[in-house]
Design a protein with these regions (language model features):
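Short secondary-structure boundary/capping elements
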Residues: 48-52
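Conserved active-site-proximal phosphate/metal-binding subdomains
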Residues: 20, 28-46, 59-67, 79-81, ...
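Glycine-rich beta-to-alpha transition loops that act as phosphate-gripper elements at the mouths
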Residues: 1-4, 67-81
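Active-site-facing alpha/beta catalytic cores
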Residues: 1-29
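Generic structural signal for well-ordered alpha-helices
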Residues: 5-9, 53-57, 82
Length: 308
């Protein structure tokens, strides 16, 4: 937003404005990976970025940076979709960042399995969700890894440590610990047990989630192997400031370092996080990617320069 940019200029660039080479505007609804939603953005209601980009240009001009280019990222597939932004005096110097489309090029280092998956995605196969251990929303492909986390989140139930009229049904948490849940949640317990989800985990929100024995063992192993890659991690409860966030590890999340490392080194594409921009479904109908072979980066750039 323009307000955020003004704060950044004041704090980091006020005395060094000549070093600002450009400002990247990343559309939170269409970009892949972590999403930069503001407090006023509604996740389920995508907005055109035009007015926000004009606001950014106005802030730059007010700070003597009127010629600094704005780089538009997120949802950029072809330049013909952005004609209203090019040679537009309200926006000024502008550039475009392509993040999703180059993934299916000959030079792209992702695995062949990952490339083939991208080629067959539908519009609803990329979802914005809150599973990242960073605490930010992120956009990723809805594979079995993401669906597992959705299942954990959607089946979580409240509990009480004491038996009450509302929380009347006992459920064994461990050898020496019994919790109590509501009668209406017993159906969820039965459903999860039929799926093999017989282990329980307490979340930081004082709810119970269901995991298989193997899933819980793997998550405990991942927490034990935490290397502190984040300043604060929702999954492991690590904090670089105090050693712990003071909360329970949240198994509705995952070890992001492990998952990105695995899939980045030709690991299983179904059991790891696959960040993706919302427009990945366009691969299926883009003639450049339906010739039986992957185009080179040069071919992609030549196509982009034609506006296609």
């Amino acid at each position: 937003s323009g307000r955020a940019l003004q704060i950044l200029i004041r704090r980091g660039y006020d005395k060094y404005k000549e070093f600002m080479g450009g400002v990247i505007y990343e559309d939170p609804w269409f970009a892949g990976g972590h999403c930069g939603f503001s407090n006023t953005d509604e996740v389920g209601k995508p907005q055109t970025p035009y007015h926000k980009i004009v606001e950014i240009r106005q802030v730059l001009a007010q700070n003597g940076l009127g010629d600094v280019p704005i780089i538009i990222a997120g949802g950029v597939w072809s330049l013909q979709d952005w004609q209203d932004y090019i040679d537009n005096p309200e926006i000024g110097n502008v550039g475009f960042q392509f993040g999703t489309r180059p993934m299916l090029t000959e030079e792209s280092p992702i695995s062949q399995a990952w490339k083939k998956l991208l080629l067959h995605l539908n519009l609803d196969d990329v979802v914005i969700q809150d599973f990242s251990p960073t605490g930010f929303l992120s956009s990723a492909i809805k594979n079995s890894f993401i669906m597992k986390l959705f299942d954990r989140k959607n089946s979580e139930i409240p509990f009480s440590k004491e038996q009450t009229s509302e929380f009347s049904e006992p459920i064994v948490y461990s050898k020496n610990t019994t919790y109590y849940i509501r009668k209406e949640d017993m159906a969820t317990v039965d459903e999860q047990h039929k799926k093999g989800k017989t282990c329980l985990s307490v979340t930081p929100d004082n709810t119970l989630i269901f995991l298989s024995v193997d899933e819980k063992m793997q998550d405990m192993e991942d927490i034990k192997d935490c290397c502190g890659c984040l300043s604060a991690c929702k999954f492991s409860a690590w904090s670089s400031h105090t050693g712990t966030t003071g909360k329970l590890p949240d198994l509705r999340s995952f070890c992001i370092r492990k998952s990105l490392m695995e899939v980045g080194h030709k690991g299983n594409i179904l059991d790891n996080i696959l960040f993706s921009g919302k427009n990945a479904f366009k691969f299926k109908t883009d003639p450049l990617f339906n010739r039986g072979n992957w185009p080179s980066i040069k071919e992609l750039i030549d196509t982009i320069k034609k506006g296609l």
